[in-house]
Amino acid sequence: MTEINEKSLLKQALAEIKKKFGNESIMVLGEKPPIDTEVFSSGSMAIDMALGIGGFPKGRIIEIYGPESSGKTTISLHAIAEVQKQGGIAAFIDAEHSIDPQYAKNLGIDIDNLILSQPDSGEQALDIVDTLTKTKAIDLIVVDSVAALVPMAELQGEMKDQVIGAQARLMSKALRKITASLNKNGTTVIFINQIREKVGVIFGNPETTPGGRGLKFYASIRLDVRKIQQITSGNDITGHSVKIKVVKNKLAIPFKTALVEIVFAKGISKSAEIAQLGEELGILVRKGSWFAYKGENIAQGKVNLKLLLENNTKLFNEIKDQIIEKLKENQQQSQTL
């Protein structure tokens, strides 16, 4: 068979596939117009930087996991607030039945426009996620948490019954269905997950996450969230510092980390972020115990600097704008290298 005949047959086959399944069902990669990944902010500049693309990607699956009370739900709620600020619609699948409306409100969420579901079983929760992703109207769905997605077989059985692998099979099947419509409809799904320890592991990391390997495979981004120290005010504990590590990233360089401060009842401290990033980028200069801005000492100690940024909106926004400009410059320089 000649080369001309081969090309002609291939052209006919491609035309037939497009006619049968639509123009976007098959194409030559070079003919596909380059599309920048659409993102929305996580609500934290430090996390946006660590993700490498400026925020969470649209149309993807994201897993946020870590020990209890490490800040996983707080990070997810901040993401919901950011989506709502852009005029988007978000849903919260509360499998743990533990959402605090007042805390969500404190983080900037419009609770009157947040879709909430508290499902009775894992199947029901994932069916709801699947249905919502197909509407094309939902921008973000948060599932809290994978560990609480109990299969019907386990719920209907007795306490002594062991249903091995039921949750992993449930997750794998659901993710196969959900993934197909996510990218097409631009819906992002954040799965919050817990940590378990494997029994009998002597060498290597004994930690694992519930739900089997399916979520690890289908997630475009996986964030490992850990508390590193407490934040105190006098004798009172007011929050904790959290380290977020990007352990998987299909869209940028993985293994970057972000440090944030989560304050009880308030969420991620924006003033702490501005203070940290401002110093890292040379906008704020430490001179002994003092911090200087534009050559002038403005605060003595990190605590006073954070208080100043909290109370001085003009200064906060001025430094924030400079941080954003500096980050854009750094990104452009890295792209030209």
UniProtKB/Swiss-Prot annotation:
GO molecular function, one term: ATP-dependent DNA damage sensor activity
GO biological process: DNA recombination; DNA repair; SOS response
Keyword check for Repeat: no
GO cellular component, one term: cytosol
Alphabetical UniProt keywords: ATP-binding, Cytoplasm, DNA damage, DNA recombination, DNA repair, DNA-binding, Nucleotide-binding, SOS response
NCBIfam families, per the entry: tigrfam_recA
Name of the protein: Protein RecA
